Every structure is written in C-alpha cells, then in structure tokens.
C-alpha cells in the first residue's frame, strides 16, 4: 500500500497571521538556520546567557512587586521578602545568584570570542553590539547592588558615583545630578530602582539586534574559517538545540548548588547590615564580576587617571577588530597568540584577585604591573603578533 506523501495544507488561521506578522516564518527560520557542523560546547554560552537573562527579568519583576524604594524601608522590605513572602527567599537568592551566573556565562562567551577571533571581519558589529550589552549589564548590576540598601550598597554607590567628580569642570555637577541632591539618599535610590527595572528590557532589545547581526554572516567556528559549501553546515534544530539542553542541564546544576547551599558565597556580609552614612566599612569592594576593573581603578594614584584606565579597559575591546592585525581568526592556528591569550586570561584572574584585596602594600604594586600588562596585550602585543607571527596552515573545509 502506497503512503500518501501529499504535503499538508497550512492552517488557514496561521497562514493569515503569518502573512501579516511573519512570526511562524521567523520560528521556521530559526529551526532551519544553517550552522557550522563543528561547533563545540563553548558555543552553548550564548544560549545559556539568554536563559540567564530571562531568569533575571522574571525574578526581578516579581521582586519589584514587594520591594519599597525608600531609604527608610528598602532594607526592611528585602528582609520581609526573605521572611514573609511565599518563596521570597528563593526568588531573592535566584536573582542574586543569577546575576553572578549571568556574568560568568558572558565572561566565558567573551573569552571564547577572543580565543577564536569572533571579532574579526565580517563580524565587527556583532562584537560591538555584544560589548554594548556587556556595558549595559554592568550598569544594571551596579544599580541592583545598591537596592538592598545595606552598608556595601550605600558605600559602593557613594564610591562609584563619586568617580564622576574626577571629570574636569563638570564632574561635581554630574555627581549632584546623579545623586539628586548632595549625597546618596532617597532620590538616588529611586533613580537606581527605576533604571534597574528599565535596563534589562533594553538588554533584550540589544540581544535581538545581536541575533540579527549573528544571522547575517552566521556563527564563527573552532577552525575560524568561512563556510564554503552546504556540506559544512547542519540545521540548528535539532542538532544544536539538543546540545544546548545538555549545556542548560550543567548550568542549572551549578546554579542550584549556589542557590541552595551557598547563596551568599558570592556576596558580602556587610550588606546584611543596614546602610549607615556615619560608619564606613573597613574594606569597600564591589561584586566579584567588577573586581578586575576595580583593581585597575585603584592601581593609579590619580582619581582621573584611574577612571580613564577603568573605562579604557572596556572601551579598548571596541578597537579589538583593528588592533589584531592577523588574517587568521582561530588561536588553534596561531601558536604565539595562543600563548599570549592564556597569559592575558591569567592576568585578568590576577586583577580579579587583587581587586578584592585591601588597597595597600604589595597589592597596589602588583595591580599596577597587571594593569600595565592588560593594556600591553591589546595595544602592543596583538598588533605585533599579528604582524610577525607565522600561523599554521588552515584547513580547506570544516
């Protein structure tokens, strides 16, 4: 008996909607999207970061329903969430740990891009949008850290906003404008709460733009070579959706461990003390994901110099597609760059450690050397390596 292979007629309602709003065609494009066939699990990190963003938005919206953005009630409202709101402790810990997990995924995502040359032509704008997302994440996380209104929240806000006073002529006016007064107080807290609620949705818009740029030229791959024929690609679904779910499983196991066993491991105990403008903590430190930049900030005696270097350490990433002069993308075929990459990763970890230490003695001295190497890697090493390195022969196909 012959099987009827006549194609099914599309649902009339779906067809009517899709003709006017092509969401079903868009979903079909995603499932049939051709990707390089040799992507490793490191390419899961983008999807993991997307899941982390969704978790942050959902938990953040629910927490905002119970939070009171007032200096007299903010700390108490957070404690009320922990004690009186059904599963409030779970929501808060998921949101707090989720921020760290989000940054961990994004840092690994950036590191993968650095290793495999994902910033090189024709993906420069894809890289730039990614760095803008990273900057927006940093602003969102900083404002969120202020909201519990503990000691570290208050003094962290005071220290970081005071950095703008280093700007000649207009710095003091900018700080007063940011504070909404002459010190960190209720107007500051309200502004930070409002912006902390808004910025994640801006991140979502930027992520959509990031995906549009990604689909224009497709994903990079471990070999760093362009796709030359259809046999070099496979559909995203089901091959990479299944792979993504494996990554999600590992991610959620680590996530759950921190939520249920070490929820405060990545935080600071001083933030469980209500904010007191009259008592300065012995050691003011930001969250762990800001520590490398904090170490660079403190490495320079001049406030203006420290601020310029701190922001410069991020903005230098925008110049990366042109600073790296090599025509080869992947570090797998660049023996000298591969060594430089791992030295740079070690330097970043060292800066992270130094940022969490007191600003005294050998810590400051080592921070200066580490900060110098950070900029040396981008501004000196990369252009010279690209010019003089002899890369290994590239394969003809994936």
From Swiss-Prot:
<dbReference type="InterPro" id="IPR016174">
    <property type="entry name" value="Di-haem_cyt_TM"/>
</dbReference>
<feature type="transmembrane region" description="Helical">
    <location>
        <begin position="164"/>
        <end position="184"/>
    </location>
</feature>
<feature type="binding site" description="axial binding residue">
    <location>
        <position position="210"/>
    </location>
    <ligand>
        <name>heme b b566</name>
    </ligand>
</feature>
<dbReference type="InterPro" id="IPR048259">
    <property type="entry name" value="Cytochrome_b_N_euk/bac"/>
</dbReference>
<dbReference type="InterPro" id="IPR005797">
    <property type="entry name" value="Cyt_b/b6_N"/>
</dbReference>
<feature type="transmembrane region" description="Helical">
    <location>
        <begin position="339"/>
        <end position="359"/>
    </location>
</feature>
<dbReference type="InterPro" id="IPR036150">
    <property type="entry name" value="Cyt_b/b6_C_sf"/>
</dbReference>
<dbReference type="GO" id="GO:0022904">
    <property type="term" value="P:respiratory electron transport chain"/>
</dbReference>
<feature type="transmembrane region" description="Helical">
    <location>
        <begin position="45"/>
        <end position="65"/>
    </location>
</feature>
<dbReference type="InterPro" id="IPR005798">
    <property type="entry name" value="Cyt_b/b6_C"/>
</dbReference>
<dbReference type="InterPro" id="IPR048260">
    <property type="entry name" value="Cytochrome_b_C_euk/bac"/>
</dbReference>
<comment type="function">
    <text>Component of the ubiquinol-cytochrome c reductase complex (complex III or cytochrome b-c1 complex), which is a respiratory chain that generates an electrochemical potential coupled to ATP synthesis.</text>
</comment>
<keyword id="KW-0349">Heme</keyword>
<dbReference type="GO" id="GO:0045275">
    <property type="term" value="C:respiratory chain complex III"/>
</dbReference>
<feature type="transmembrane region" description="Helical">
    <location>
        <begin position="192"/>
        <end position="212"/>
    </location>
</feature>
<comment type="subunit">
    <text>The main subunits of complex b-c1 are: cytochrome b, cytochrome c1 and the Rieske protein.</text>
</comment>
<protein>
    <recommendedName>
        <fullName>Cytochrome b</fullName>
    </recommendedName>
</protein>
<dbReference type="GO" id="GO:0046872">
    <property type="term" value="F:metal ion binding"/>
</dbReference>
<keyword id="KW-0472">Membrane</keyword>
<dbReference type="GO" id="GO:0005886">
    <property type="term" value="C:plasma membrane"/>
</dbReference>
<dbReference type="GO" id="GO:0008121">
    <property type="term" value="F:ubiquinol-cytochrome-c reductase activity"/>
</dbReference>
<keyword id="KW-1133">Transmembrane helix</keyword>
<keyword id="KW-0408">Iron</keyword>
<dbReference type="InterPro" id="IPR030689">
    <property type="entry name" value="Cytochrome_b"/>
</dbReference>
<keyword id="KW-0479">Metal-binding</keyword>
<comment type="similarity">
    <text>Belongs to the cytochrome b family.</text>
</comment>
<feature type="transmembrane region" description="Helical">
    <location>
        <begin position="96"/>
        <end position="116"/>
    </location>
</feature>
<keyword id="KW-0249">Electron transport</keyword>
<dbReference type="InterPro" id="IPR027387">
    <property type="entry name" value="Cytb/b6-like_sf"/>
</dbReference>
<feature type="binding site" description="axial binding residue">
    <location>
        <position position="95"/>
    </location>
    <ligand>
        <name>heme b b562</name>
    </ligand>
</feature>
<keyword id="KW-0679">Respiratory chain</keyword>
<feature type="transmembrane region" description="Helical">
    <location>
        <begin position="129"/>
        <end position="149"/>
    </location>
</feature>
<dbReference type="Pfam" id="PF00033">
    <property type="entry name" value="Cytochrome_B"/>
</dbReference>
<feature type="binding site" description="axial binding residue">
    <location>
        <position position="196"/>
    </location>
    <ligand>
        <name>heme b b562</name>
    </ligand>
</feature>
<keyword id="KW-0813">Transport</keyword>
<keyword id="KW-1003">Cell membrane</keyword>
<feature type="transmembrane region" description="Helical">
    <location>
        <begin position="366"/>
        <end position="386"/>
    </location>
</feature>
<dbReference type="Pfam" id="PF00032">
    <property type="entry name" value="Cytochrom_B_C"/>
</dbReference>
<feature type="transmembrane region" description="Helical">
    <location>
        <begin position="245"/>
        <end position="265"/>
    </location>
</feature>
<feature type="transmembrane region" description="Helical">
    <location>
        <begin position="304"/>
        <end position="324"/>
    </location>
</feature>
<feature type="binding site" description="axial binding residue">
    <location>
        <position position="109"/>
    </location>
    <ligand>
        <name>heme b b566</name>
    </ligand>
</feature>
<keyword id="KW-0812">Transmembrane</keyword>
């Amino acid at each position: 008996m012959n099987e009827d292979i006549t194609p099914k007629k599309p649902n009339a309602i779906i067809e009517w909607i899709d003709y006017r709003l092509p969401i079903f065609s868009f979903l079909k494009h995603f499932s049939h999207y051709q990707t390089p066939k040799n992507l490793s699990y490191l390419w899961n990190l983008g999807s993991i970061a997307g899941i982390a963003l969704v978790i942050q938005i959902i938990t953040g919206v629910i927490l905002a329903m119970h939070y009171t953005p007032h200096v007299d009630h903010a700390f108490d409202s957070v404690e009320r969430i922990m004690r009186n709101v059904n599963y409030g402790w779970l929501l808060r810990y998921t949101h707090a740990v989720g921020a760290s997990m989000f940054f961990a995924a994004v840092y690994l995502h950036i590191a993968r891009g650095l290793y495999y040359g994902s910033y090189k032509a024709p993906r420069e704008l894809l890289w730039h949008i990614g760095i803008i997302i990273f900057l927006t994440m940093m602003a969102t996380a900083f404002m969120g850290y202020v909201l519990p209104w503990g000691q570290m929240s208050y003094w962290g806000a005071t220290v970081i906003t005071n950095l703008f006073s280093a700007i000649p002529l207009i710095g003091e006016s900018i700080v007063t404008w940011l504070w909404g007064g002459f010190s960190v107080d209720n107007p500051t807290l309200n502004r930070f709460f409002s912006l902390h609620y808004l910025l994640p949705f801006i991140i979502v818009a930027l992520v959509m733009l990031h995906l549009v740029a990604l689909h224009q030229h497709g994903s990079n791959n471990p070999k760093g070579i362009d796709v030359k024929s259809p046999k070099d690609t496979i559909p995203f679904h089901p091959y990479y959706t299944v792979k993504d779910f494996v990554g999600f499983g590992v991610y959620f196991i680590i996530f759950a461990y921190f939520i249920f066993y070490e929820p405060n491991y990545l935080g600071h105990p001083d933030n469980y003390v209500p904010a007191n403008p009259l008592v300065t903590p012995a050691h003011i430190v930001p969250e762990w994901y800001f520590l490398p930049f904090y170490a660079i900030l403190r490495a320079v005696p001049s406030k203006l110099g420290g601020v310029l270097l701190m922001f410069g350490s991020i903005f230098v990433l925008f110049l990366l597609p042109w600073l790296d002069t090599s025509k080869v993308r992947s570090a797998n075929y660049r023996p000298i760059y591969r060594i430089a990459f791992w030295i740079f990763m070690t330097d970043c970890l060292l800066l992270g450690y130094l940022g969490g230490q007191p600003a005294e003695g050998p810590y400051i001295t080592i921070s200066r050397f580490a900060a110098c190497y950070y900029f040396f890697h981008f501004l000196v090493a990369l252009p010279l390596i690209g010019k003089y390195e002899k890369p290994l022969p590239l394969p003809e196909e994936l």
